[in-house]
Amino acid sequence: MTKNIHDQRILILDFGSQYTQLVARRIREIGVYCELWSWDVEEADIREFNPDGIILSGGPESVTEENSPRAPQYVFDSGVPVFGICYGMQTMAEQLGGKVATSTEREFGYAAVQVTGESALFADLETTQDVWMSHGDKVVEIPADFTKIAETDTCPYAAMANEEKKYYGVQFHPEVTHTKNGLKMLENFVLNACGCEGLWTSASIIEDAVARIKEQVGDDEVILGLSGGVDSSVVAMLAHRAIGDKLTCVFVDNGLLRLNEGEQVMEMFGDQFGLNIIKVDAEDRFLDALEGEAEPEAKRKIIGHVFVDIFDEESKKLKNAKWLAQGTIYPDVIESAASKTGKAHVIKSHHNVGGLPDDMEMGLVEPLRELFKDEVRKIGLELGLPYNMLYRHPFPGPGLGVRVLGEVKKEYCDLLRRADAIFIEELHAADLYHKVSQAFTVFLPVRSVGVMGDGRKYDWVVSLRAVETIDFMTAHWAHLPYDFLGKVSNRIINEVNGISRVVYDISGKPPATIEWE
């Protein structure tokens, strides 16, 4: 009998660390299902979830403060292995009888940890480990039934363990790539201490999702808004595998897409994969609605409202459609849940996080709501979607509507599309595209004097933007070679009639945002 991929599970309690979602992604990489919940979860919820192990994340608070977060007592009464990371180790130590003190100097950055004792956590690892530290407090006395298993020159208890209960604590962050063997430590905890197997694979996720879609919708028809982006594309492939022609995709070409994107979506999903697609050519409708509007937030709202209106109209034509499929992913669920309840553990509740009207009277099909973006891409590859589509740089929902600064006009969009296509084409040709995190072109609604042949011309300006980032929360501008930038600039000015000047944006985030609007 095939094992259910959700049967083995790890619970991660979030104490507010910027790395907490990264912990969850690492556990999934190991091949084990996990969920991320707020630290103040009710005991009954943990009992119902019935985890094979619990991880206490890092966090910005100080255990030495009176009202700082604590793990629920049931964590230590449940009988399952527990792994405390940074703040998680500190609250574990303090709650189980140890002592934590505020350090005179904050430890931040690389550190060499000396493994001082035998421990299942460090099985098959060297006695010296390069790790990433980020803490102010530190454990100064471990609980009576714990042993020290690692130290640094400035941190006497860099790791501790109660091997009998399978409780482990580390003062560093094993989830970040800076900790060289961090993934191995997490594997030792999840696979060895907790006894989990690697059931969570791309193939098994697809099999599970297809079965769940079939069970959920039965013989009913399903409608999906297909944008050509990663999430909706993967949902389309999963739903089509599950229910075939009972899926109808609605693709709205709003005139704000990249060069030839509409044709590419129809060719790939209609001609190549054989999906039922209704294409709505709505360029005029969107541009008419945007006429005269220059304020970015207002433009976003207009584009969103027009899309919803069109989708609503098309869905009403499909009398038998009882279900709406959406590309909601796990970070959307976490963010939406936290904003509504202050807690992140409502993965089971089916609330609409996609902005479509609540009166559509359809059930929601959200096969990606348990998945992180990197997992979505991996199952997309398994489903046969092309690498270059799945790993394409992020593109904003409003499309060129927020990359044309100020008022959006067809002329501006056409110029921007062609300039951006040249930039992206040259990035691929120079093998630079996948070395930057995001690259695009922005249309500036200002004219600049240029020289063409013997004459002068007075045409528009575009800006090239390329950034390097890990999490898109902060970003550095990409130091692209001057020769490369020169080539792109020359091509745009020579090939796109109407553009006389190309500039390169060298702003970091912060203070600037990645997108201009």
From Swiss-Prot:
Q: Does the keyword DNA-binding apply?
A: no
Molecular function GO terms recorded = ATP binding; GMP synthase activity
Domain (Glutamine amidotransferase type-1): give its ranges.
9-199
Q: Which residues make up the binding site for ATP?
A: S227, G228, G229, V230, D231, S232, S233
Q: Which domain of life is it from?
A: Bacteria
Read off the Pfam families from this record. GATase, GMP_synt_C, NAD_synthase
Q: In which pathway does it act?
A: Purine metabolism; GMP biosynthesis; GMP from XMP (L-Gln route): step 1/1
Sorted keywords for this record are: ATP-binding, Glutamine amidotransferase, GMP biosynthesis, Ligase, Nucleotide-binding, Purine biosynthesis
Which reaction does this enzyme catalyse, per its entry?
Answer: XMP + L-glutamine + ATP + H2O = GMP + L-glutamate + AMP + diphosphate + 2 H(+)
Q: Give residue ranges for domain GMPS ATP-PPase.
A: 200-392
CDD domains to which the protein is assigned, alphabetical: GATase1_GMP_Synthase, GMP_synthase_C
Give the Enzyme Commission number: 6.3.5.2
Instruction: Name any GO cellular component annotation.
Output: cytosol
Q: Which residues form the active site?
A: C86, H173, E175
Matching SUPFAM superfamilies: Adenine nucleotide alpha hydrolases-like (SSF52402), Class I glutamine amidotransferase-like (SSF52317), GMP synthetase C-terminal dimerisation domain (SSF54810)
Q: What class of enzyme is it?
A: ligase
Q: What does this protein do?
A: Catalyzes the synthesis of GMP from XMP.
Subunit structure as annotated in this protein's UniProt entry: Homodimer.
Protein name, entry field: GMP synthase [glutamine-hydrolyzing]
- Protein source organism: Vibrio atlanticus (strain LGP32)
Upper classification of the source organism reads:
Bacteria, Pseudomonadati, Pseudomonadota, Gammaproteobacteria, Vibrionales
Gene name tied to this protein: guaA
